[in-house]
């Protein structure tokens, strides 16, 4: 039995300089697991609640000492002595202890830190790498990365309304070569921007944040960077967008302030369809407001067979909402953010539900990250096939890519890189 003998919660800082929760779990054998939780900037209204202190004079109200106290008192008391290898039972214990639908009492940040740290300790005790502990012998597929090389929206201080412009390397034989491709395009883009006298400062997720005149201009410039780096747009490298449309939906209209447009759901569907026709876009995330299900249905019917349509704010890693979306034919993919739901067991259930329905699952970071690389192990362990973890700068992003390199090396000859086949939801 891998009995839990000590639990320590603490307040640390994330990549934006805001407090977040870290947890250490010590087992009877002496093995230890440590996990830190991320935090989002653009968040879905139905996400599990991240508990903040609200004390204005300390970290502008964003302290997490209450969440840490929950770990060090009642959570510790509830799970002390439990078997760390019984993840589902441990997470069930946390859920029952919290007793709310949205984890608002204990805080999803407190619960997730414990859930992750326990899994890491159990993997260490079993002598297994974390991805193997999660996925068993079937874990051998590396994910295709969606690399956010231009930031807009809530992730940057510029005129772009769309939040993320991503490159997706798909023709490479290995993850290592895909990562190299992404890095080379990133540096080619930096040179293009510099030559134009545009800003090469980066946003929260490590992508550049220049003031392009339009989304079209941004996408055209990325195509130039792909070619400049020696790759073929549409063959070697595809494009992906995260609209984060909930952020610019006001008074029933999609208000693209940077372009002076106010569009209905049907008009915004036309707008996105035009971009998808003009550029090699393989994936669009949050293309409609999270509550605009009629708009989502329009978008899915229009583009769902040729473009991956990812629900982030739409589904918030929640199986109940995902099930309803599947039944109504909304979207064809789910973004998986571990802190949206708050336990590993619930996270894994969402991934499995998506796969059973023919939806893809994209494992994702948050804009406020730490050096914790657990999501890399989740992506491989559950054979998710896709990961979204930022640009090719900032160590809080690179830590996940570097972990994937280590996993690929550990797998050796049995490692596979799916490329375009990762988008099995497109027919």
UniProtKB/Swiss-Prot annotation:
Associated pathway = Carbohydrate degradation; glycolysis; pyruvate from D-glyceraldehyde 3-phosphate: step 4/5
Q: Does the keyword Zinc apply?
A: no
| Species this protein is from | Burkholderia cenocepacia (strain HI2424)
What the record notes about the co-factor is: Binds a second Mg(2+) ion via substrate during catalysis.
**SMART domains, alphabetized:** Enolase_C, Enolase_N
Q: Which PROSITE patterns match?
A: ENOLASE
Q: Which cofactor does it need?
A: Mg(2+)
From the Swiss-Prot or TrEMBL record, give the protein name: Enolase
Please report which protein family the annotation says this sequence is part of: Belongs to the enolase family.
Q: What Enzyme Commission number(s) apply to this enzyme?
A: 4.2.1.11
């Amino acid at each position: 039995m891998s009995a839990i003998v000590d639990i320590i919660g603490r307040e640390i800082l994330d990549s934006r300089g805001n407090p977040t929760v870290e947890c250490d779990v010590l087992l009877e054998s002496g093995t230890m697991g440590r996990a830190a939780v991320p935090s989002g900037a653009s968040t879905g209204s139905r996400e599990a609640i991240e508990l903040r202190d609200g004390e204005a004079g300390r970290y502008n109200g964003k302290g997490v000492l209450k969440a840490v106290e929950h770990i060090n008192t009642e959570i510790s008391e509830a799970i002390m002595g439990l078997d760390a290898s019984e993840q589902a039972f441990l997470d069930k214990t946390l859920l029952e202890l919290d007793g709310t639908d949205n984890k608002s009492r204990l805080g999803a940040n407190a619960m997730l830190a414990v859930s992750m740290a326990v899994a890491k300790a159990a993997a260490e005790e079993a002598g297994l790498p974390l991805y193997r502990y999660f996925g068993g012998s079937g874990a051998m597929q590396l994910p295709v990365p969606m690399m956010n090389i231009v930031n807009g929206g809530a992730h940057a201080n510029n005129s772009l309304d769309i939040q993320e412009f991503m490159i997706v390397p798909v023709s490479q034989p290995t993850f290592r070569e895909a990562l190299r491709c992404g890095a080379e395009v990133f540096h080619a883009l930096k040179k293009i921007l510099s030559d134009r006298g545009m800003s090469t400062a980066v946003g929260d997720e490590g992508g550049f944040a220049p003031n392009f005149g339009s989304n079209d201009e941004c996408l055209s410039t990325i195509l130039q960077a792909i070619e400049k780096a020696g790759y073929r747009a549409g063959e070697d490298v595809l494009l992906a967008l995260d609209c984060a449309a909930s952020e610019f939906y006001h008074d029933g209209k999609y208000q693209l302030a940077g372009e002076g447009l106010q569009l209905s759901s049907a008009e915004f569907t036309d707008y996105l369809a035009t971009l998808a026709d003009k550029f090699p876009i393989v994936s669009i995330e949050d293309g409609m407001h999270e509550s605009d299900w009629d708009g989502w249905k329009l978008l899915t019917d229009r583009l769902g067979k040729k473009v991956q349509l990812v629900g982030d704010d739409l589904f918030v890693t929640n199986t109940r909402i995902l099930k309803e979306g599947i039944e109504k034919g909304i979207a064809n993919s789910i973004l998986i953010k571990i802190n949206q739901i708050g336990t590993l067991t619930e996270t894994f259930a969402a991934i499995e539900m998506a796969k059973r329905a023919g939806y893809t699952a994209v494992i994702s970071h948050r804009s406020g990250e730490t050096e914790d690389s657990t999501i890399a192990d989740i992506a491989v362990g559950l054979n998710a096939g896709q990961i979204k973890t930022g640009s090719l700068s900032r160590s809080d992003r690179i830590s996940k890519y570097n972990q994937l390199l280590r996993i690929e090396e550990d797998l050796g000859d049995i490692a596979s890189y799916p490329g375009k086949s990762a988008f099995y939801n497109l027919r």
